[in-house]
Amino acid sequence: FYVSLANPHRSREFARGMGIMTKTDKVDAYMLACYAFLKNPHRWEPPAPEIRYLGALLRRRDVLLGDALREENRLEKYLSTDTPADIISSCMHMAQLLRDEVSNIERQIKAHIKASPALRRDYTLLTSIKSVGPQLGMHMLVVLRSHDFSSAEQAAAFLGVVPIEKRSGTSVRSRPRMSKIGPPQLRAKLYMSALCGKIYNKRMRNIYDEMCLRGKPKMVAIGALMRKLVHWCYGVLKTGIVFNDEGLKQVLST
């Protein structure tokens, strides 16, 4: 036998589709057996150790950065109110400690990537795409090397940047919207990179302007740029070729 990691939301929706509302160990075992038989999910392979370690470092950095921002917001509030000096001093000390630890983790991340030829190569390929910066590049590296995506479309669907259409019948007819499943933190980084790309990346700017001229809402055009970034990231890792506007057309085109 082999192990497969099923999406818990999808497996639960599968159970509801079978008319199973009860949730016990015995019922779950039966439902998962039916799910595996009918869906034949992919075999799960653990990521390489260097990918797992990089992912752990990135998650730790994000947690520390969030804590540092919250502490700095508290400090701003304390400075604008009648707060005792000891409290302000404690808050300033804690904010500085958190910032120092963020810097320490970032140094570890850079050293880890530099020490691994495979990570260094993949990182160079990803950041060869204009508007893919260090943070997006490292996070996309972890996602794309942790999952065996068969296509760029599958990677985009995993990250929740594909449109969902509801046009069946009249009662459910609505505008297409982004699915927004998957990791929201990475989707936020894609959004910021898309905003940067529509200004500084000529190809992305042309895509954005063309969609706006066709009457598409601006947010729809931004979503298309986010999707395009995922396709390009998948393409450079799939081919092992540094990104350029002329090459890789068969893999990078959407």
Located regions from the model:
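Short, conserved catalytic/metal-binding motifs centered on acidic residues
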Residues: N7, D28, L32, L64, ...
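Short helix-capping/linker segments at secondary-structure and domain boundaries
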Residues: K39-W44, R145-F149, C196-R203, V230-D245
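Basic, amphipathic alpha-helical segments enriched in Lys/Arg and hydrophobic/aromatic residues
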Residues: L213-T254
